[in-house]
Amino acid sequence: MKLTACIITFNEADRIDACLRSLSFCDEIVVVDSHSTDATRQIAGSLNARVIERDWPGYRSQKQFAVESASNDWVLCLDADERVTRQLREEIEALRTRGFAEHAGWSVPRITDYFGQFLRHGNAYPDRLIRLFDRRRGGWTGEEIHENTRVTGSVGRLHGHLEHFSYRSLSDHHNRMARYADLMARALYARGKRCGLSKVLFNPAWRFFRGYVIRLGFLDGWRGMVFHLVEANYVRRKYLGLYILSKGLS
């Protein structure tokens, strides 16, 4: 059974090489690039990826376009800052020999590198995502931000990690989450959602407490604390933005 890897990119020259090399076992690699101004497309092309340039419509739409551009029905979707580990690769290759027959899709545990150390507790782990699936029975859905995959049928569980090297610096993490929060506030408002001050005040505190205390995020040391503080600030900014829109104050 043939397999296509699907990735979307924009200015990922410093990370796309490692991502694509971890996908060398795939029969095809499709990279959909949003007009990068660095060497992303050249690097991808040199590693035998099929590169498609396309204007940016949003995360969900771009990822679904990549899936639809694949030559094979079974697809493995990655972000440019992710890498397939050896264990995960071996699991996928074993599935291929059976034609992926057992399920419509497979979830993988994603583990995030945070300033040189993988986070193994709290809200960051295990971050299970359906990334290997039959595109005839599933695809990308949800908001243009915080998109996800859904399949019609059963979902199996793989155990090898998908490594995530997302944040280049603390400011990068903070700025990215601030941007996501603003986008989500507008998306929620467009869907008719409204909120009061209680969510602005209490939801961030609960998110931090749940991740850092209940889910043992403190075991990741200072990295766990910083990660969950940034996450709590994301929740605060999201609901504050929705509150401002709800009151017509923007």
Q: Whereabouts are the PLM-identified features?
A:
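Cell-envelope/extracellular polymer assembly enzymes that use nucleotide-activated donors
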Residues: 2-4
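Conserved donor nucleotide-binding strand/loop of the catalytic core
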Residues: 41-69
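Short, well-formed alpha-helical segments that are part of the catalytic scaffolds
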Residues: 7-25
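Catalytic-site signature of metal-activated, phosphate-bearing donor transferases
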Residues: 64-67, 73-74, 78, 85-250
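Conserved beta-strand segments of alpha/beta enzyme cores
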Residues: 28, 50, 154-156
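A conserved acidic beta->alpha catalytic loop
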Residues: 22, 33-43, 79
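Acidic helix N-cap motif at the loop->helix transition within catalytic regions
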Residues: 17, 38-47, 87-88
